[in-house]
Structures are given as structure tokens and as C-alpha cells.
Design a protein with these regions (language model features):
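Active-site cores of enzymes that catalyze phosphoryl transfer or operate on phosphate-rich substrates
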Residues: 519, 532-605, 609-614
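Conserved small/polar residues in nucleotide/adenosyl-binding loops
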Residues: 619-623
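Conserved short alpha-helical segments that host acidic/polar catalytic motifs at enzyme active sites
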Residues: 2-553, 566, 574-577
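Secondary-structure boundary elements
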Residues: 250, 615-616
Length: 624
């Protein structure tokens, strides 16, 4: 097996953190939970009918990725001669190992050690039959050794499911820190008591042929989630094929850099009764994976912490609401509360998800990726990124339609019930007294008044302009026309200004931020054309509080209608003494004569002062 030195390693302008893709997704589920091989076969046909959604190499044999998520086929496993206990009392999943025997053994030792730490046993290791002959050159060169693990030792399914999650995260953490040469070839595709995933660096037509298990008539499931990957600006790899552990995703998360950064920042204050030592499973988001994988990591963590699957999805991918798109007051309060806790994972996205019991789909709040659904009279539901993925006679169809922006459609296979968005969101909105919490704790900046006289001039105006990097052109050509005409000034000849980081002159803070790639949409989107899904609302307060435990203390925030403040509003914030709020001024000055060392000392002092005053609203000032 060749070493993947050319894949997934940061080099030149390529960074694996920028992984995005655009794909085909499909879900087929028996609403009443009935299992059959027919569902697996139908799902594979859905995948094959979306072949045009995936990408292939020049050899027409190397795909960007294809996969299927199924319920664990208990009877099929018994027929393989594996003496597993009854359903729900064992965990299983596919694991990708390097083909080097020494590395394989070293990784297996780590796995066994972590499994036994939780009081469990690695009961069996099955070599998954595969058909390597159908692979293209690139896929064959990087093909892992695929094994199916079976873990026993706990009779409580919920407890075992959580233990399996913790074990996998610990193994991933140890592998990332290990010196095993091909450790990046190791990947746990799934490890669960409820679902199993078959996937790889395949194209849609290859999946059933590469994994003979999938064509065995005794392999049954009550639901199936399929995915055909098209990498828009990334390398195909075995580990980045979808579905992931809970979801399959068509689209992009354009806010991914901020989402990852904020999630990493709040890890230190997270705590959950279900996961006593969260430090052991950090980082929650596995490094060097795609945007879809990062979203799946966070979704999986929330569900493992006790949050319901629809609650977690509604929190991560909220729908829009305003005067043009009214929703109930209770649901509005639900979203306002959660907007304080978690920034939206935003971007064009069709999301299908399942944990083995629940299965459903939703769209992003813009609705920029399509998804259609169909329900038959005999209790089958199909959701896919396009119509026509399965053939039905017209008299078989009970209902069909398209998923709406920000709306969820969910099936509970144990209850045998379809939950539409309205019923789901009503349950979520009524779970806590969100409106009361907000009313008692949240402060609206626009409603605060001050008797202080605040001048609308700035002392040392010219000096302050130079200090903050404003040029005459910024004032005369950009800011003044915006203030006078309420429109953004239009210029020609493009922007040929060098990067701010290379300039010898002071630069505006904003000049250091650029688009990472061509973040465009068709049609164009801006706050004027799309005010239905745009918001300038900002919150100031204790952003890093523990988001896993519902608490009205999270609502102790100051709400800003927009981030641009008047002098009066800024003065109110700097002198706030209302509902327990208070503020502290932190000077951001240093002795220029001391050069770089003076700047470093001043920054260290600023950080220390911020830590000491963290219970207050902090604001920096260019004055002592």
C-alpha cells in the first residue's frame, strides 16, 4: 500500500480544513420499522440513479466517494457464525486500518486498551469481504484494510451507545498523537449499537459490488441513507466518503471556519452529566476533515450529551424568522435563546440524518439545495436531492412534496410515526420557558436610555484617524457617500491594494479579512434582496457558558439590533449598571519606544486584566 503523502496533508495553498463538497443524498425508510433486504436494494438503486451527482476520475473507476448507512443487520451477523448477544447488547462498526501488519497491530492494541478501560470486550474482529478488482488506480493505491469490530460487555443499550462514542473519541485522540506512520489511514466509519455504515472511495455503481455483504438477501434494514460525493475543491479520500455517523450532506457550510473556532473555544467550559470527563474526548471536532464531517462531529456530541436529534438539528441549522416569515412566539423564543448559545452552521445544505431509530431530513434556512420527499400508501418514505430516484405507480403515492427552508421532516421507526415540522417545533418550543427566561434576563440596548450628555465629536480627530488606519480616501470616497446617500459607493478598476499584512503602514482591522474562496451564490444574495434570511443581531455577554445544560442564566446578554453603535449607545454599554451588568475599561496602549517587547508585554498585561475582569463586560480603549 502506498503512503498517502499527497493527500490530506497541508501543503502550498491546499489545506484539508477547507474541505467542501456537493453531492447527491437519498433516504428510504419503512415508517413502521419493518426490515427487509428490499429496502437495502432500493437504496442502492437510489444511489445508482444519482450517479451523475458524484464524481469519477479519468479512469471511470475511481469515485469521490459513495456509502450507505443501515440499521445493524442482526440476523445477517448471526449467519456469519459470530455469536453476538441479543439486539442492542453489542456494538459493531467498520474500521479502516493501514495494510501494514505492524501498524495494524499497534492500532489494534490501542483500541483494545481503550475498550477495556470502559469495562467492555472486543469480542470479534471480522475481515469484511471486498472486491478490490473493481477499484481504479488511485482508490486501490490508498485502499485500507477494512475490519468489522464487535464489542460486548454491557446490557443497557443507551449506556453502551455512550461508551462506544467515548471509546471512539479516545482512540481518535490517541491516534492523532501517535507516531504510527500511516495513522491517517486509520478511520472508524461507525461504531454503534443501532447503525452501521459501508462506504469508501467509490463511485455510485461500485458500492454494491465492492461490498458483497450489501447484496446478501439476509442483510436487512428498516431504513437506508445513501450518499454520492462530488468534491468541489478537495481531494477524494476513503475517510471523507459519506454518510458520516449521523448525517449525509449535500452542499457547503460557508461559515465553517467560525463554527470550528467557536466550538473549540467553548470546549473548556462544556460539562454534561452523561460525559463526566469531556477533556478525554477533546477535540470534539476531528481535525483535517470536511465541513460535513465537522457538522456531524458536533451533532453527534450533542446527541451523546442527551440532546434529542431534532433539537440538535434545529439548534445547529435554525430556520429564519421575521415579519415576512412569522412563526409562533414560543418558537421564536426557542430560536432567540439558542442563537445566544450557538452560531448557525450556515450555507446551502440539504441534510439527511439517522441514528438507526429516527430518520429524517431538513434544508438550510435559505433553501439553496433541493430535497424532495414522497410517502407511499404502504408506509414507505423516500427523501432525496432530486425526484425520480425511485419508480412508483401514481396510485401508490399518498403524499409528495419538497422540504421547505429550515423545516424538518422526521420518522420515528419505533413509534411508526411521521413527525412534520410544526409538531416537532411545537414540542421543542414548549420544553422550557424560553420567553420568560429572555424577558427576565436579556437587555435590549435600543430600550436603554441615558441622561448623560455624549458629544458627537472625537477629541484629536486627525490623530485618531491615523491611529486606527483610516485614510482620506476611506473618509471621502467610502464613508461619507454611505452616510449621505445611504448606498454603498460604486467604483471601477478593481481593488489592487496589497494585502494588509504586507503593508508598511497602519491598516484598518477589517482590511486583514478576505474571502477564503469564491463565496458566491446564484442568484446573488445580499441583505436587501434576501432580508427574509438575513439578520444583523448581535449579543454581548458571557458567550462561553455551558450550552449543554438549559439555564435561564444563558439569557443574561445585551442584544444589539446591529453591530454599528452610536456614541450614545457605546457610552451606555461602557457605563452599564443594569440587571447585574457592569463593565470594565481595559487600556490598549504600549510604550512605542520599547518596540516589539513593549507590545508583547502590553498584550500579556491586557490578557491578564481581561481574565481578572471576566465577570464584566470588557471594552478596550485607546486612552489610559
Amino acid at each position: 500500500m502506498k503512503v498517502r503523502s499527497h493527500l490530506n496533508n497541508k501543503q502550498g495553498l491546499y489545506d484539508p480544513a477547507n474541505e467542501h463538497d456537493a453531492c447527491g443524498v437519498g433516504l428510504i425508510v419503512n415508517v413502521h420499522g419493518g426490515k427487509s433486504h428490499g429496502i437495502v436494494e432500493s437504496a442502492l438503486k437510489v444511489l445508482e440513479n444519482m450517479r451523475h451527482r458524484g464524481a469519477e476520475g479519468a479512469d471511470n473507476k475511481t469515485g469521490d466517494g459513495a456509502g450507505i448507512l443501515l440499521q445493524i443487520p442482526h440476523e445477517f451477523i448471526l449467519l456469519q457464525g459470530i455469536p453476538v448477544p441479543e439486539k442492542g447488547k453489542y456494538g459493531t462498526g467498520l474500521v479502516f486500518f493501514p495494510k501494514d501488519e505492524k501498524q495494524h497491530s499497534a492500532i489494534l492494541s490501542i483500541m483494545i486498551e481503550e475498550i477495556e478501560k470502559e469495562g467492555l470486550t472486543l469480542m470479534h474482529l471480522r475481515k469484511v469481504p471486498v472486491n478490490t478488482d473493481i477499484l481504479g488506480k488511485d482508490a486501490r493505491d490508498t485502499e485500507p484494510d477494512i475490519k468489522q469490530v464487535f464489542i460486548t460487555g454491557c446490557d443497557d443499550q443507551q449506556v453502551l451507545e455512550l461508551k462506544l462514542y467515548i471509546i471512539r473519541k479516545r482512540i481518535e485522540k490517541r491516534m492523532a498523537a501517535s507516531d504510527i506512520p500511516n495513522r491517517k489511514d486509520f478511520y472508524v466509519a461507525s461504531l454503534s449499537t443501532k447503525s452501521i455504515i459501508y462506504k469508501g472511495m467509490l463511485e455510485s455503481m461500485q458500492l454494491r459490488h465492492y461490498f458483497p455483504d450489501l447484496t446478501n438477501p439476509y442483510l436487512t434494514s428498516g431504513l437506508a441513507l445513501v450518499h454520492s460525493r462530488f468534491s468541489t475543491n478537495t481531494f477524494p479520500t476513503w475517510s471523507l466518503a459519506q454518510p458520516f455517523r449521523l448525517l449525509a450532506h449535500n452542499g457547503e457550510i460557508n461559515t465553517i471556519r467560525g463554527n470550528r473556532g467557536w466550538m473549540e473555544a467553548r470546549e473548556s467550559v462544556l460539562s454534561s452529566p452523561r460525559i463526566p470527563n469531556i477533556d478525554e474526548i477533546r477535540p470534539i471536532i476531528q481535525p483535517d476533515m470536511s465541513d460535513s464531517a465537522s457538522l456531524d462531529n458536533v451533532l453527534e456530541f450533542f446527541v451523546a450529551s442527551g440532546m434529542s436529534l431534532p433539537h440538535a438539528m434545529a439548534m445547529l441549522v435554525p430556520e429564519s424568522f421575521n415579519e415576512k416569515n412569522p412563526i409562533s412566539e414560543d418558537l421564536k423564543a426557542f430560536y432567540e435563546y439558542h442563537s445566544i448559545l450557538m452560531e448557525p452552521w450556515d450555507g446551502p445544505a440539504a441534510l439527511l440524518f439517522s441514528d438507526g431509530r429516527y430518520a429524517g431530513g431538513m434544508l438550510d434556512r435559505n433553501g439553496l439545495r433541493p430535497a424532495r420527499y414522497l410517502i407511499t400508501k404502504n408506509g414507505m418514505m423516500v427523501v432525496a436531492s432530486e425526484v425520480g430516484v425511485m419508480d412508483f405507480e401514481p396510485d401508490e403515492i399518498e403524499e409528495k412534496g419538497r422540504l421547505q427552508p429550515g423545516k424538518i421532516l422526521l420518522v420515528d421507526t419505533e413509534e411508526g410515526k411521521i413527525y412534520y415540522d410544526g409538531e416537532l417545533k411545537k414540542q421543542l418550543a414548549g420544553a422550557q420557558f424560553y420567553r420568560v427566561w429572555l424577558a427576565n434576563n436579556r437587555v435590549e440596548l435600543d430600550e436603554l436610555k441615558s441622561g448623560r450628555h455624549v458629544p458627537h465629536t472625537v477629541a484629536g480627530y486627525d490623530r485618531m484617524l491615523r491611529t486606527f488606519g483610516y485614510s482620506r480616501e476611506d473618509i471621502e470616497r467610502i464613508i461619507a457617500p454611505m452616510c449621505i446617500g445611504s448606498t454603498e459607493p460604486v467604483g471601477s478598476m478593481g481593488n489592487d491594494i496589497p494585502l494588509a499584512v504586507l503593508s508598511e503602514h497602519p491598516q484598518l482591522l477589517f482590511n486583514y479579512f478576505r474571502q477564503q474562496f469564491a463565496q458566491v451564490t446564484n442568484p446573488p444574495i445580499d441583505p436587501l434582496r434576501e432580508d427574509l434570511v438575513m439578520s444583523l443581531t448581535e449579543y454581548i455577554g458571557a458567550v462561553g457558558s455551558n450550552i449543554l445544560i438549559p439555564n435561564e442564566a444563558h439569557c443574561k446578554m445585551v442584544r444589539l439590533a446591529h453591530p454599528i453603535l452610536t456614541n450614545t449607545q457605546l457610552d451606555i454599554l461602557c457605563n452599564i449598571r443594569y440587571k447585574g451588568f457592569k463593565s470594565v475599561k481595559l487600556p490598549m496602549l504600549f510604550e512605542v519606544s520599547q518596540g516589539c517587547e513593549g507590545l508583547k508585554t502590553a498584550l500579556d498585561r491586557l490578557c491578564m486584566q481581561a481574565e481578572q475582569s471576566v465577570a464584566c463586560l470588557l471594552y478596550t480603549s485607546p486612552s489610559p
